[in-house]
């Protein structure tokens, strides 16, 4: 469900005509729906109702301060994977005790900053990281609450680049070594064992891999408690997928996911943490672009838009599909014609769609790339010296720019010429 719909033949974000945003902000730009973000968070919160739980938004998917504050005001915690994300969460008003710190490469400086801010939990990914955190905490006279991220060797059946729970992936420690490393953690100064963490991948469209992983976590919980560890939290990660095309079979709903959690680990009496990102943000955003040129040869047609791979890298990086629709609603019965939708960047990889059936379009028409709320703006770059795309948040009939497009002078101003040139 999202709140981008045609009204009177024009695509709207909630109650705002998208053309109005394009006129005020320019294109390309990202547009997010407050109503969609709110509803998607609430679906997860409701799915775990009656259980002690915290929904920690995976802010690597979308980290604008306005979005973080919106979700934080709804009661969300945050899952961060860098010192920069931690700083963003705190700047958005998220208290330390609602932040979990994940990631395989935490630095000593990041650990110290999070400890000083009363971090809820570190998700530890390796034995060397555990020893380093112990040293940092002991030096500060602090206690670091930790959950060990276990790798259950489960195939998430997702894209190769976003699978994280196989033994060949860089994440976590083999579940067979977990008891050994928990024993080490209990012996180290400055470390408090509070739970277990697991995360097997992103964009999962079946509950079966989750079930395999969570049953292994349940078994490990019993073993660790028998070993004397106070396992009171289970961080079950995120990864539930979204439909990137309306023709696809819909992935499981949060309610079904919540039922699985109750069935697999609900009797353990643990507080449950989950880290959804894509399902909260993915369909809550679109990339708004303008058609620059229609290029036609005898056997091929290209639609060249002003958005590019530096703005939305997912098609180039993952071969990802995004529905692309005109702001003016296509009438029933209109003949579609195949076209490649491409951007201005000087690479053949700057292609959003190949042989995509598209309605008749003219230069200057506006197009919306759907399902562009997650892993989109956060992965943008200034490749080809193109300014970062602005972000816009809509609420009802209002909209506001929540990240401005930098000027060329601002981009150039970050460079420095050494005096010897």
PLM feature segments, named:
Residues 260, 267-421:
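Charged (often Lys/Glu-rich) extended helix/loop segments that serve as interaction or gating elements
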Residues 79-80, 123, 147, 197, ...:
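Conserved beta-strand positions in the central sheet of alpha/beta enzyme cores
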Residues 59-63, 84-85, 105-106, 126-128, ...:
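Active-site-proximal loop/turn and secondary-structure-junction residues that shape catalytic pockets
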Residues 68, 91, 111-116, 133-136, ...:
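Short acidic, glycine/serine/threonine-rich loops at helix termini
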